[in-house]
Amino acid sequence: MSKAVIVSTARTPLAKSWKGAFNMTHGATLGGHAVQHAIARAGIDPAEVEDVLMGCANPEGATGANIARQIALRAGLPVTVSGATVNRFCSSGLQTIAMASQRIMAGEGEVYVAGGVESISCVQAFPSP
């Protein structure tokens, strides 16, 4: 059984204001920036990434349409790299890290990107029925 290790991390600034600089920045743009820099710091060829797994508590509206795939593309990964969005609400990002490590340990691949994304100001809190 292979061991899974985290070789790089990156995150975007955490904002507490609905009026902040990143207020209306799309989650895929923020996520793409973080993924691009995590891969660069790790010294990994982007083509080596098997899959991008992203947790998202509100995967609808601006963060819908498989935001993990959008992040992969905005991070500059090749179009051959797939993306999967996981919705487990508060534990979505942690779940993707567990899933990526399980896939590595099971021998299903070697390089995965896993994490979470949310741009809550771009998602309506209470959509109309």
What is each of the regions a protein language model found here?
Residues 11-13, 77-78, 119:
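Active-site/binding-pocket entry motifs
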Residues 14-40, 58-61, 84-98, 121, ...:
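Active-site pocket-shaping loop/turn-to-helix segments
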Residues 37-50:
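Phosphate/pyrophosphate-binding loops at sites that engage ATP/ADP/AMP, CoA/4′-phosphopantetheine
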